[in-house]
Each structure stands twice: as structure tokens, then as C-alpha cells.
Amino acid sequence: MVEKAEKNNTENQKMEELLKIVQQYTEDDFQKIISEKKDFFFLYHLSPMRRNILEWYPFKKDAKVLEIDAECGGVTGCIADKVLQVTSLENNDLQRQINECRNSKKENLRVFTGTYDKMENELERDYDYIVMVGSFAKAPDYFADEKPYHTFIKSAFNHLKDGGEILIACDNRIGMKYWSGCQEELYSDYFIGIQDYIGFDNHKMRNFSKKE
């Protein structure tokens, strides 16, 4: 418990530093900052490579998009550059501030603090796309029933217009990095995703294989 608390404190300190960075510098400076920091935390949150996950996708230019769990906005800017309107949700208010600050010039973007389950009744029901980058695994945090992932998808569909799409990006639980000995990102343990989370109940977060 002490180790976990120390880890959380360290991450909060880095988040506060990240907020100062996006307040004082532009995206043109981020690569230099990443090189100086030599820390995966800053690489993950500041690298323009994060855009690649959706840069290729043919969004309709007049589209409305809901982004669930936007984190610090590493992907948000990419979406906002491609569509008419973006609504982003982020549970952590500090991360929401970072997102708003780094994307402050995006006039088509609104960012709110709150989890999907708490905000769901306030959301519109005519989005063209709903984007879940890393958030689908958190379904058990939002829904306490026996099939939280099914419930999450069904709930999200209620906020799409006819013909709308849900875009999901999450770790492949049997991806090569896990066969190579990397820790499972949700639990910082080894091979549990490859073993299909044996012993876990439906109320634990998990990742999926491509086939799943």
C-alpha cells in the first residue's frame, strides 16, 4: 500500500509538471522536452506519435465526436483537426486542465471533467463517432452488472445517430509485447492477459484479443 501511494504521489507530481509545460510551451517544443526528460511519462503524454492511432481514419468533416477518457489530450487534438465538433470526457480534473490548455486553440472542442457513467444522462444522442482509446477496459468501473463490457457498448450506441460508429482501441491481451515478457499494463503483472485473466471475475478490468 505504501509503494502504491508513493507511485500515485510521483504521478501526481509529474501531472502538475506536465500542466506547467503545456502552459508555458507549444507543441513545437514538446520533442525537445521529451529528449531532456528521458522519462516514458512525458513521452507518452507529449509525443505527436500518439496521433497516429487515429490520424489515418477517414472521419467525416462535418461529424460530431464524443471522446471517452481523453486523458491529457494526446489524441484529442488529432480528432479536433478532422471534424466539426468534439466533446471530450476525462475523470481526472488535472488531466482535463492539461487537455484544455494544450488544445486551447481548438474552437470546436469542449472538455468536461467526469466519468462516462456519471455524465451519460447529460450527453447528446446524435454523435457520428464515439472514440474509446484505452477506455473500454474500464467498463467495470462504470457498470456494476454481470456484463459490464456489453452494457458499455449498448449504452454508447444510445448516443449515436443512425449509421454512427464506435471506435475502440485497447491493448491486445495476447500481443507480442506480453509474450516477450512485458508487464500487463492494467495490473503490472506478467502473463495474466495471455492466461485470459484466470481467477478474475467480471468486475475486474481486462483487455481483449483481436478476435474477441
Feature-to-residue mapping (PLM):
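N-terminal auxiliary segments of SAM/dcSAM-dependent transferases
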Residues: 1-25
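Conserved SAM-binding strand-loop segment of SAM-dependent methyltransferases
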Residues: 105-118
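Short alpha-helix
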Residues: 201-212
